[in-house]
């Protein structure tokens, strides 16, 4: 699974996931399923914000150019992927600036158009079950919840899906691709089932050989989705972004 993750996700996403796990004392080489889940969640968060801007009239627009107009403001502030101290600093700054209620838990995004924090969920289970778990944990009507599954299902607070259908379809397609590629390598069952995951972990610890058929290089389709994770007050510099790829994992 670790080799699969490193080959199928952008290096910046992998690096952020490793830092997040190490911050909580977790080892990506051992807890490989969690490693894959964190990378997937990060990518969905970046894809959620990709191409979405607010123009000078305050209207939400989609710009797919690699060189966005400097007058445009990013619609979403990405909070997920930052270390906890910086993440809370950004949240506090948003709350002080907008007057929105401070959440009890760190959200994933802030929507400047909708004036709300957003919690993104990616589940291997039924979307409604995961949605209820999120809602029970957050216990706040102020934070918007949007859940995606690997089967193309989604669920959002008050059926408000925030994004246009095409943008959501990109996310669903990517998740379905990840599932198919995991399945083709015999990794999906262990990713879904804790019991199977434990069995797979024992097997992986016995053999550290690289997954057969996985190449050492990957090709990149550039996208403006992965922006440098700077504080919100440095927004003017964010257009000088890291180019990232949402890769379709290479076939065997």
Curated annotation (Swiss-Prot):
Gene3D superfamilies attached to this UniProt entry: Influenza RNA-dependent RNA polymerase subunit PA, endonuclease domain (3.40.91.90)
Keywords per UniProt: Decay of host mRNAs by virus, Eukaryotic host gene expression shutoff by virus, Host cytoplasm, Host gene expression shutoff by virus, Host mRNA suppression by virus, Host nucleus, Host-virus interaction
Disulfide bonds: none
GO terms assigned for molecular function: RNA binding
Localisation per UniProt entry: Host cytoplasm; Host nucleus
Site note Important for efficient shutoff activity and nuclear localization, residues: 195, 198-199
UniProt superkingdom: Viruses
One BP annotation, GO: viral translational frameshifting
Active site: 80, 108
InterPro entries: PA/PA-X, PA/PA-X_sf
UniProt site positions, description: Important for efficient shutoff activity: 202-203, 206
Function: Plays a major role in the shutoff of the host protein expression by cleaving mRNAs probably via an endonuclease activity. This host shutoff allows the virus to escape from the host antiviral response. Hijacks host RNA splicing machinery to selectively target host RNAs containing introns for destruction. This may explain the preferential degradation of RNAs that have undergone co- or post-transcriptional processing.
Family according to the record: Belongs to the influenza viruses PA-X family.
Domain characteristics, as noted in the entry: The probable endonuclease active site in the N-terminus and the basic amino acid cluster in the C-terminus are important for the shutoff activity. The C-terminus acts as a nuclear localization signal. The C-terminus is recruited to host protein complexes involved in nuclear Pol II RNA processing.
Protein name: Protein PA-X
Organism: Influenza A virus (strain A/Turkey/Ontario/6118/1968 H8N4)
Gene giving rise to this polypeptide: PA
């Amino acid at each position: 699974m670790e080799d699969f993750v490193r080959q199928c996700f952008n290096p910046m996403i992998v690096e952020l996931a490793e830092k997040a796990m190490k911050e909580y004392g977790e080892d990506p080489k051992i807890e490989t399923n969690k490693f894959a889940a964190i990378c997937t969640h990060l990518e969905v968060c970046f894809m959620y914000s990709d191409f979405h801007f607010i123009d000078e009239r305050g209207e939400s627009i989609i710009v797919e150019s690699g060189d966005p107009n400097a007058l445009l403001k990013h619609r979403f502030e990405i909070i997920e992927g930052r270390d906890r101290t910086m993440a809370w600093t950004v949240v506090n700054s948003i709350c002080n600036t907008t007057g929105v209620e401070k959440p009890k838990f760190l959200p994933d995004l802030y929507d400047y158009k909708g004036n709300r924090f957003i919690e993104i969920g990616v589940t291997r289970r039924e979307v409604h079950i995961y949605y209820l778990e999120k809602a029970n944990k957050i216990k706040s009507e102020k934070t918007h919840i949007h859940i995606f599954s690997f089967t193309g299902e989604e669920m959002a607070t008050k059926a408000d899906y925030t994004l246009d259908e095409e943008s959501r379809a990109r996310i669903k397609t990517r998740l379905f691709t990840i599932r198919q590629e995991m399945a083709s390598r015999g990794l999906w069952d262990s990713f879904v089932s804790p019991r199977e995951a434990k069995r797979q972990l024992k097997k992986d610890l016995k053999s550290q050989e690289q997954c057969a058929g996985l190449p050492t290089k990957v090709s990149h389709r550039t996208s403006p989705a992965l922006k440098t994770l700077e504080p919100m007050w440095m927004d003017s510099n964010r257009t000088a972004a890291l180019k990232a790829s949402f890769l379709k994992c290479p076939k065997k």
